[in-house]
Amino acid sequence: MKRRFTTPTHVGNITIGGGAPIRVQSMTTTNTNDTEACVAQAKRIISAGGELVRLTTQGRREAENMKNISAALKAEGIMTPLVADVHFNANVADIAAKYCEKVRVNPGNYVDPARTFKHLEYTDEEYQAELKRIEERFVPFLNICKEHHTAVRIGVNHGSLSDRIMSRYGDTPEDIVESCMEFLRICKRENFNDVVLSIKASNTVVMVTSVRLLVKAMDKEDMHYPLHLGVTEAGEGEDGRIKSAVGIGALLSEGIGDTIRVSLSEEPENEIPVAKKLIATPTPLPLPEERGDVTDVKSENLSSPLSPSDIPSTPLSPSVPPHTVARWIKDDVLYVALNEDDADDVKLYAAMWAGAPLIDGKAHELVIYNKGEVISSSEELRVKSEEFKLREANRDCQSNGNPDSSLFTLHSSLADLSASILQAARVRFTKTEYISCPGCGRTLYDLQGTIARIKAAVSKAAETNPRFKTLKIGIMGCIVNGPGEMADADYGYVGAGPNKISLYKGKECVEKAIPEAEAVQKLLDFIEKDA
């Protein structure tokens, strides 16, 4: 894999891009005014291997306290760069730039007001005037950054695009890219080069498509700034890790990405090992871009191919009714048993195994039986062997000339994993989809506990109402991305103040300021009534 060429960006004592290693980072969830708590959490992130630590700075007090947090860490000999996360207030960015190694600004709300989903009409002259207004405010900030050797991340989130940009370009990957490019062009004109860019979305397809378009847009204008990758609001547990792997991994495998953050609704230090595994995982994909009918391919890898009478087989052609795809394992040879009624399902599972799965493990030989013929393909299948439930075969069979192979059946958890990968890639939905942010210092309720309660309540409700399995539910810490990401959700639960919650149907707020203790049940009741 050849990494995309990028110019170096200097962030404190590290470099992002320019051939430097891919950096891993996370973000604190503590109150930024609580110096002791922030330092303790930052140290946990750093001990796990984090190379940058981001903190929310929603106001002047938080921005000013970054000085104390930085001093406390440096007093212990910790020089890890700190990043201030700024939304809605350009003045806060000016303050933070004096005390942090990097400041993240959001083009969606740096000068523009928070989105209201209203369509705004602009003449060309009026729109240019809006761009001039942004430049007049952004350039003084860049000058402060130059003075203090502070880097900048231009971080666009799909959930917080401005009404201005959406009215002009629509809610598409192209408008996400343009939101970023407007600010980037100012940086280039001002010869400000310590820049990192990010485009994030909870939808992996939107995220990957937008980043690819951004790379093309930069290349067209001779820009080669480094990229920060992440799937925002990925969730927690296995689903959060899979969604992050699908989005971030797809781009890393193309050589795109200079720093990554895996956004999990968990303790921030849990994100670091996942990020490190993703960086270590991508390999060049050996499969050709154009493939013929796999049923025309024959294998010579087995000394004695088995017939259908020896082992169940399934045609991969949609014109023939499917029965079973059987796969066996011996050392580095893997056969997987499936039992799908739908030909498309068979092809999806077969394609997934023949591609490049993103789960950590060792390489195997993949063998598929089709109409009595052996179709063989060597791939690096990253699957932990303990994911398989083993059972002794009632007879020996031959595989790669070895008569000592044993039959393995596919563990149900691996089938669930396969379904989760397909859902994360937005190919097929088989369960409730959760869009949940990792939380930060802006979150004023128990986010992790709430996610667990909502999941448990929805799972129980789904036992009697299958509709719950088809829903997308957003669980957001605050309003920065909350309302915007609700546009991709059926229902939403968004923090609205200390222990207060707002409920959404799509992007429409249906009830405000609900006490946290009542909000989960109110969400369930609303979904039931809305059905």
Residue map of PLM features:
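N-terminal amphipathic alpha-helix/helix-capping segment at the start of soluble metabolic enzymes
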Residues: M1-S26, L142, K146, S313-V336
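Conserved, mostly hydrophobic/aromatic
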Residues: V24, D85, I154, L197, ...
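Glycine-rich, proline-tolerant flexible connector loops at the mouths of alpha/beta enzymes
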Residues: T29, G50-L73, P107-Q128, V195-T204
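Glycine-rich phosphate-binding active-site loops on the catalytic face of alpha/beta enzymes
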Residues: E51-L52, C100-T116, E254-P268, K362-V374, ...
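Alpha-helix-loop-beta-strand connector modules within alpha/beta enzyme cores
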Residues: E62-A84, R133-E147, L214-M223, A456-V458
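Glycine-rich tight-turn/loop motif centered on a GG-T
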Residues: E101-R137, R164-E174, V510-A513
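Catalytic alpha/beta core domains of metabolic enzymes, predominantly
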Residues: E121-I134, M166-P282, P312-S313, S317-S378, ...
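Short, basic, low-complexity termini and linkers enriched in Ser/Thr/Gly/Pro
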Residues: T283-V320, S376-Q398, N402-S413
